[in-house]
Amino acid sequence: MNSPRTAQEFIHWLEVGAGARWLRWAALAAVTVALSLRVAWTQFHGPTSEITLLQADTGRQVMRGEGFTTLVNFPQTAAVLEARRVKFDPGQAYPELHHAPLYPLTIAGALWLLPEGSREKWMSAAPVPPDGFGGDYILLGLNLVLLWTAALLTYRLGRRLFEPRVGALAAGALLLSVASWQATVAVNGTPLLMVLILAAFLVWQRLEELAGAELAGGRLAAWNAVLGGLVGLLFLAEYSAGTLVVVAFGYSALRFRGRERWLALAGVATAFALVTGPWIARNVALTGHPVALAGHNLALKAGDPTAEPTTMRTTLSATAPPVDLRKLANKTLTSLQEDLKSRMWAGGAMWLTAFFVAGWLYPFRAGPANRLRWVFTAALGVLLLAQAALNSGETERHAAVWLAPIVMVFGAGFFFVLLGSNALLGLWPRAAMAALLGLQALPLAHDALEPRRLHFQYPPYFPSLFQGMRLELQRREAIGRFGIMADVPAGVAWYGRERAWALPPRLRDFYAITLQQPIGELLLTPRTLDRPFFSELNARPILPGALSAVPNRFGEWGEIYAGLLTGALPREFPLAAPQKLAENLYVLLNPALPPVRGK
């Protein structure tokens, strides 16, 4: 029946025809949207890290036609570029040198699609608590769309490798996974990596279909080129994810023979080089390294005071950190241990992880599914190892989380194998599916029933304050002449739409920066003032005459922090007018700022 012409045909079309299928899809879409809105309403609290905010700011810069630049002035970036004879210019933003570009580019695309008037209104309006910043809601919408896309691709991969029930179970498990939702509402770009890895395995599934076909040489080369391009996009989304190219080369070398092998290898290599080449060339031109300053992550480890990545970025030095093999091994083993003991099980797949692991002992009857399971096992090992070694530990996009949809597909496949071998449960497949999805959904149900959160991450981010700091400089006609410095510079850049220097750990770097641009405002948030040493400083009775002993105990900034308590900042410190907004929130103004216009 092409289209119903009578009421009876229409009813039949709705009950058993194509209309019934459309109704089921519409109902599923409505439930998915309703679930998404509920979880987002209760769990969304804006970007939670400087890394995410930095990438959001870079995306906005790309959308504005400013290229891959950032409003965040890292002292390390300033030092590296100055060593290459690029001087600081208050009218020209620094290039972004610490992160892969694909998520910012995706953000730029989402911003560009919005009407300009609406976009500017959302990006400039000060939020009224508990509502959030308009730009944060745009990031949330983007990540929701990416998660829905990942769910559709999960269904498709499960259906093509096994059967529709497997795809439905895996997609449902993804949409009911609390870890997937935590990554989504954190707007850190994890769903983008899910989409890319799922697309890569759909291409691998297509290659399995072509592997035994006659006269498939040209199509094999084309599909391998698509695979190489997708792996290149993974590299541009997360540098360590680019190591999947090793698995792609290994698959092409082992799966094909003779001329087809060389065509497959050439397709992967050519496409990977074409996708990644321009970005690598840009990084080499700016810094001399293929991944720019992200290459330092090999030697850095979050939480290690001697190799803290934040300290490296905020230090005015162009010197690369030395690689200590003992520290590298310790970092790698610690991260792998955390992946295998915790993230693999709590990373989204949960119960299906157990079915996936148990399935290693069982060969699937379908050859392509069996081969791709081992391809994925190799990919899982390579990606976990690469992220553990090459990342500093700051990332929010853990491989164990964005690989979870494929774990779910193979776990669901083995689940139905077990179901079919059980005489009792095999009679009730839908009930068994519902029970498994119910267990998967329990943590998410708990989160969805919580009351609404504040829709921005305070502390330390307060969008209205950051916007007010920019307006203060505008009122004094000091934009560009004086800069802003903050311990959360990406927050100031994203919410305040103004360039901000990152607070250096050394006072001498602070004074060196003031020679390039006088600092008009310094923001100290709970990120700094709630640290244990400041709490200890706050608890001690401090006398003005005792300030000289403070720096030895509390670091170079100790005298400044002590001055916030006593009201007696050092005379040589240029930001001598502190404004106390809360016990752990200060804005220090420079008395040299011009007076407010009109006064």
Predicted regions and their residues:
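Perimembrane helix-loop-helix junctions
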Residues: 5, 9, 208-210, 243-273, ...
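Hydrophobic/aromatic-rich transmembrane helices and adjacent perimembrane loops
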Residues: 183-184, 190-194, 234-237, 243, ...
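Hydrophobic, aromatic-rich transmembrane alpha-helices
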Residues: 154, 249, 253, 333-373, ...
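Multi-pass, polyprenyl lipid-linked donor-dependent membrane glycosyltransferases
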Residues: 138-149, 169-176, 180-207, 211, ...
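Membrane-embedded, lumen/periplasm-facing catalytic core of multi-pass transferases
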Residues: 43, 430-491, 504, 526
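Signature aromatic-anchored transmembrane alpha helix within multi-pass, membrane-resident enzymes
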Residues: 24-31, 165, 172, 220-229, ...
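Transmembrane-helix signature of polytopic, membrane-embedded enzymes
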Residues: 118-133, 149-176, 194-195, 424-430, ...
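Transmembrane alpha-helix segments characteristic
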Residues: 29, 169-170, 174, 226-231, ...
